[in-house]
């Protein structure tokens, strides 16, 4: 399954979670898209609930099913911690996500574009792979030639608060993943146990 590239508001309303980070698409119409959206309140089966939770998280990070599943498999091989927590942590360690968490982009989709276009450095070296796994202590910065890109400057100015597990220097346009996040610091609205149950049945 390829990565979804359509309007993010449709998936936001379908799964009841803001994919843009603004929450406006949910506040405006808090029901699924389509002609019968307001009346579409059918009860989901156990499988349906698990699938919906998986899709909700997958669309939040903007990954294809293959990318998402491969990361889940990697999480099952981590010796310490629960699979659910390890999976969420690996998602958070993606370079595009860290760029978003630092406030260098307004959405994860935009962060992925910045990485792909070579605007981002890791420990002073350009990395254009969105899935690059950032380790605590690594410095994420903007390439000197990209420091005046309007979209980056606008994102930094628009960011009002940042997660406790990152630090950011707005003057230098650089930040650090200080530590791995606690579970309650990342997507607390996601029930990762349902996702684990889903993949346990599929694998």
Curated annotation (Swiss-Prot):
Residues 93-156 form the S4 RNA-binding domain. Signal peptide: none annotated. InterPro entries: Ribosomal_uS4, Ribosomal_uS4_bac-type, Ribosomal_uS4_CS, Ribosomal_uS4_N, S4_RNA-bd, S4_RNA-bd_sf. Pfam families: Ribosomal_S4, S4. One of its GO terms (cellular component) is small ribosomal subunit. One of its GO terms (molecular function) is rRNA binding. GO terms for biological process: ribosomal small subunit biogenesis; translation. Disulfide bonds: none annotated. CDD domains: S4. Keywords: Ribonucleoprotein, Ribosomal protein, RNA-binding, rRNA-binding. Part of the 30S ribosomal subunit. Contacts protein S5. The interaction surface between S4 and S5 is involved in control of translational fidelity. One of the primary rRNA binding proteins, it binds directly to 16S rRNA where it nucleates assembly of the body of the 30S subunit. Belongs to the universal ribosomal protein uS4 family. NCBIfam families: PRK05327.1, rpsD_bact. This is Small ribosomal subunit protein uS4. It comes from Lactococcus lactis subsp. cremoris (strain MG1363).
